[in-house]
UniProtKB/Swiss-Prot annotation:
GO terms for cellular component: cytoplasm; nucleoplasm; nucleus. This is Protein BTG1. The lineage of its organism: Eukaryota, Metazoa, Chordata, Craniata, Vertebrata. The gene is BTG1. GO terms for biological process: cell migration; cell population proliferation; negative regulation of cell growth; negative regulation of cell population proliferation; positive regulation of angiogenesis; positive regulation of endothelial cell differentiation; positive regulation of fibroblast apoptotic process; positive regulation of myoblast differentiation. SMART domains: btg1.
């Protein structure tokens, strides 16, 4: 099988988790119809898959992490904005529906988020790489590399985090 198709197949779960998380904000506020939500979700999945297709490295999950990061920080992430335009949501409406500060990391085998600059990092989705007898050592390496990925992104902060707690959210 061609390496790209293998990589693309591995990002389906991660993208679905990220899109579901963002869509829940729209659903919770009740300002969009179910059909609009489906269109938004499908559009965002397609946009993310296209955006990530040359920046997805299951063998090195941290590689490309900054590129794949979805960020709302008083500016709307452009991919979320494009998906919202397809259902007729204005930027102002979108800002009312989503947190003003949101970071969503979409990495191979893990999707995590932080709301607010000083919020805790929460894990939305976790998967193990397909492997044989070395699975336990692979998982240990992955945990270390996931944390270092996020630490690298947090290094540019202007204020230190009040809390840096990892917690798993199961759905």
């Amino acid at each position: 099988m061609h390496p790209f198709y293998t990589r693309a197949a591995t990002m389906i779960g991660e993208i679905a988790a990220a899109v579901s998380f963002i869509s829940k904000f729209l659903r919770t506020k009740g300002l969009t119809s179910e059909r609009q939500l489906q269109t938004f979700s499908q559009s965002l999945q397609e946009l993310l898959a296209e955006h990530y297709k040359h920046h997805w490295f299951p063998e090195k999950p941290c590689k490309g992490s900054g590129y794949r990061c979805i960020r709302i920080n008083h500016k709307m992430d452009p991919l979320i904005g494009q998906a919202a335009q397809r259902i007729g949501l204005s930027s102002q409406e979108l800002f009312r529906l989503l947190p003003s500060e949101l970071t969503l990391w979409v990495d191979p085998y893990e999707v995590s988020y932080r709301i607010g600059e000083d919020g805790s990092i929460c894990v939305l989705y976790e998967a193990s790489p397909a492997g044989g007898s070395t699975q336990n050592s692979t998982n240990v390496q992955m945990v270390d590399s996931r944390i270092s990925c996020k630490e690298e992104l947090l290094l540019g902060r202007t204020s230190p985090s009040k809390n840096y707690n990892m917690m798993t959210v199961s759905g």
